[in-house]
C-alpha cells in the first residue's frame, strides 16, 4: 500500500503563449502584398481531474513541478500557431487547492471532474492583426503572454459518507472490516490506524463509503497526537459513527471528551449527525457499563455491538443506511477564481527609487505590456514607448524627480530618460 499523503505544495507553471509573426506576402503578381504574420497559439492550461481510484496525494509529493507546454509561434501567410495541449493531473476525490495567497481555487469532488489550476498565456498577435488605415504595413508583432506560475497548496479531505469516530483502540479497524470490503491493519495498541482506510458498504440496494480515521485523543484540536490530521477529514463526513468501548474505565467520559474535541476544532461539528455505537459488548462487565452509559445519554440512541464476535453488525448497517437517506451531500466550497484580477487589485504601474539611484517601474498592466514586447524589434520598442505614455508614466516620472540622463529600469530592461 502506498503511503498516505494528505497535504503537499507544488509549483505549477502553465504554458506561455506563442509569439506573433512578422511577415509579408511576397508572391508573384501581388504588388502590395501587405502584412501576413499569424498569431501565436495559447499556452497550455493545467487541470486537476478527479480519479476515484486514488486515495492519496503521494504522486504530487514526488512530482512537485507541474508544467504545461508553450503555444506554437505564428507563421507566415497568415498561419496561426496551434494551441498547446493542456496538462491533466489525476488527484483523489476530496482534493482542495489554494493559490499562493491562500485563495481557494476549488475542490475536486467527483470522478472525472476537471478543475482549472493555472491558465496558459494568450498567444501574441502577428503583424497582420495591427494593419490599419494609418499603418498598412506594420513591421512588429506581440510576444505571447506568460502562463500563470505560482506555488499551489494542495490538501486532501477524505470523501466518505461515514467517518468512524472514537479513541484509539476502541475497535474501529475491526468494525470497518466487518461492515465493508476494507482490509485494515488490526493490532492491540494505540494508533494502529495512521492513515484513513476507506471501505464500501452494501446494504441491499444501497451503498455508501465509510472511512476508518486515525484515533482521536484529548487536546487533538491543539495538534496533540494525530489530532489535526484526523479532524480535517471529519469535515467531509455526512455521518459520524461514534464508537465507545465498553471495556473502558469510563465510557461516558470518553464520549464527552471526543465530542468536546470536535467542537473545539469546529463549532459546526456539534450539529453533525452521530450514530453512537457501544462496542466490545463481549467483554466481562460490558452489559452493566452499557446500561449506565445508555441511561446517562437519555434520549440518544445507542447501538450495542461486538465487532470481534460479529454481533449486531447487520442492525448497525441498516441504521447507517437509513440515516444517510435523510442527509444531503455537501455542496462544494465557495471558490475564488484566482486567475481573474479584480479591478481594485490591479495596479497599472508603481515607481520606486532603488538604492543604486535607478528609478524602477513595476505594476500589473506594465508587466503584461512588457512581456508582449520584442525588444529586438525597433518598431515594437517604439510601440511600447507609446503605451507607456498612454499609461501616464512619462508625466509620473517627472513628478518623481526624474531628469534628463537618469536611468529608468522596467523589470529587466534599462533605458536612459531623454526629454
Swiss-Prot record:
Record domain OBG-type G: where: 160-325
Entries under Pfam families matching the protein: DUF1967, GTP1_OBG, MMR_HSR1
Any one Gene Ontology molecular-function term assigned to this protein's record: magnesium ion binding
EC number assigned by the record: 3.6.5.-
Stored CDD domains: Obg
Obg domain sequence ranges: 2-159
Protein family (similarity comment): Belongs to the TRAFAC class OBG-HflX-like GTPase superfamily. OBG GTPase family.
Function: An essential GTPase which binds GTP, GDP and possibly (p)ppGpp with moderate affinity, with high nucleotide exchange rates and a fairly low GTP hydrolysis rate. Plays a role in control of the cell cycle, stress response, ribosome biogenesis and in those bacteria that undergo differentiation, in morphogenesis control.
The name this protein goes by in its record: GTPase Obg
Name of the coding gene: obg
